[in-house]
């Protein structure tokens, strides 16, 4: 059975970020947290990279079944650089690091 994954992330818009998404079709009944594959995208179209080196990485953080569509999941993601560092627009990662530092 095919399953639709809708990857969702915040772009690099200034002064306000916007939601972006792209769809991937995978084999399987359903996807749980930790099962959604890492996926790449062209960051130049989302204000997250220059045209000459525009590869960015979507790292899934949380997966939810889509309540509006059968055989579909919503995949909430962070944006990372290809060198496995958080992208500068990745404010969630900055928050996680701050919370760890405070504890």
Name what the model sees in each region.
Residues 1-103:
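ATP/Mg2+-dependent ligation/transfer catalytic cores
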């Amino acid at each position: 059975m095919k399953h639709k994954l809708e990857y969702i992330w915040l772009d690099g818009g200034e002064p306000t970020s916007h939601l972006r998404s792209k769809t991937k079709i995978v084999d399987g009944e359903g996807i749980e947290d930790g099962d959604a594959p890492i996926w790449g995208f062209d960051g130049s179209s989302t204000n997250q990279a220059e045209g000459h080196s525009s590869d960015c990485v979507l790292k899934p953080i949380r997966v939810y079944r889509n309540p509006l569509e059968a055989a579909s999941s919503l995949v909430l993601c962070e944006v990372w650089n290809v060198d496995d560092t958080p992208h500068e627009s990745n404010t969630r990662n900055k928050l996680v690091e701050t919370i760890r530092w405070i504890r």
